[in-house]
Amino acid sequence: KPRPGQFFGLM
């Protein structure tokens, strides 16, 4: 399960 920081980091 990806962390919120990783999700926004990809964007």
Curated annotation (Swiss-Prot):
Modified residues (Methionine amide): M11
One GO biological process term: chemical synaptic transmission
One GO term describing the cellular component: synapse
Keyword Zinc: no
Disulfide bonds: none
Coiled-coil regions listed in the entry: none
Entry annotated with the keyword Cell membrane: no
InterPro entries found in the cross-reference section: Tachy_Neuro_lke_CS (IPR013055)
Localization in the cell: Secreted
Domain of life: Eukaryota
UniProt keywords, alphabetically: Amidation, Neuropeptide, Neurotransmitter, Secreted
Family of the protein in this entry: Belongs to the tachykinin family.
Function: Tachykinins are active peptides which excite neurons, evoke behavioral responses, are potent vasodilators and secretagogues, and contract (directly or indirectly) many smooth muscles.
Full protein name: Substance P
Organism name: Scyliorhinus canicula (Small-spotted catshark)
